[in-house]
């Protein structure tokens, strides 16, 4: 990481009006790269130079940038703050580019999404999927799907679960302190939210955020 710091200092020496950084952390291990991202963000803010940071790493873009521009084959798909880009994607490309999404072509077969209609694709992210053991109490017990865990991966503070539901392999995260789930186990799955768009279209304003229709009903029942 020291070489990158020196190169950055040299680039700042002439006091440029604009700084271009093209994949500056591409050949660095993960921990050093994370440290350099924080350091670079602090330095750019302190010096006050407008910077263009080119990267294929979504985490780098989200952490370092004030504004992100996502391009696809030379076309600008969306521009906005990191929160806007991540939480309100405007095109199918952006929806599937950010996070760790799963595309679902048969979303109407899932509880709470039956009314969406045919001809829609949906994208779901791990943070919008709840996986619980059969023995655990769930607020949405009447709306869950049954799934089978195909893979469990340790991720430090949490585990990543790959769960097969309706021939779709969903990805979800579960806190490490929660009861362990094993491969091959049958579990309950609930999808809180999806990003939906017409199949085969790639317009600029055709992605809708759709919440599970059973959430409000289950909340009233639970209270």
Q: What role is predicted for each listed range?
A:
Residues 1-91:
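ABC ATPase nucleotide-binding domains
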Residues 31, 97, 135-136:
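Residue-level signal for well-ordered alpha-helical positions
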Residues 49, 103-104, 145, 170:
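Structural detector for hydrophobic anchor residues on beta-strands
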Residues 80-84, 96, 117:
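Short, surface-exposed loop/turn motifs that are enriched in glycine and acidic residues
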Residues 87-113, 121-123, 190:
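C-terminal boundary and immediately downstream tail of ABC-type ATPase nucleotide-binding domains
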Residues 112-223:
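Non-catalytic connector elements of ABC transporters
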């Amino acid at each position: 990481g020291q070489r990158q710091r020196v190169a950055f200092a040299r680039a700042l020496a002439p006091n440029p009006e604009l700084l271009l950084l093209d994949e500056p952390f591409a050949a660095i291990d993960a921990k050093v790269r994370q440290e350099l991202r924080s350091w670079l963000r602090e330095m750019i803010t302190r010096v006050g130079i407008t910077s263009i940071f080119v990267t294929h790493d979504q985490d780098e873009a989200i952490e370092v940038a004030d504004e992100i521009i996502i391009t696809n084959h030379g076309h600008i798909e969306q521009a906005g703050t990191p929160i806007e880009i991540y939480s309100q994607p405007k095109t199918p490309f952006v929806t599937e580019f950010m996070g760790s999404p799963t595309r679902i072509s048969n979303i109407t077969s899932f509880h709470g999404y039956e009314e969406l209609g045919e001809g829609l694709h949906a994208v779901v992210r791990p943070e919008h999927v709840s996986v619980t053991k059969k023995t655990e109490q769930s607020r949405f017990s009447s709306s869950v799907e049954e799934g089978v865990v195909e893979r469990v991966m340790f991720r430090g503070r949490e585990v990543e679960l790959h769960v097969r539901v309706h021939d779709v392999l969903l990805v979800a995260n579960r806190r490490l302190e929660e009861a362990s789930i094993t491969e091959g186990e049958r579990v309950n799955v609930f999808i809180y939210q999806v990003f939906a768009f017409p199949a085969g279209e790639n317009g600029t304003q055709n992605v809708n955020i759709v919440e599970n229709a059973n959430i409000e009903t289950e909340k009233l029942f639970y209270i």
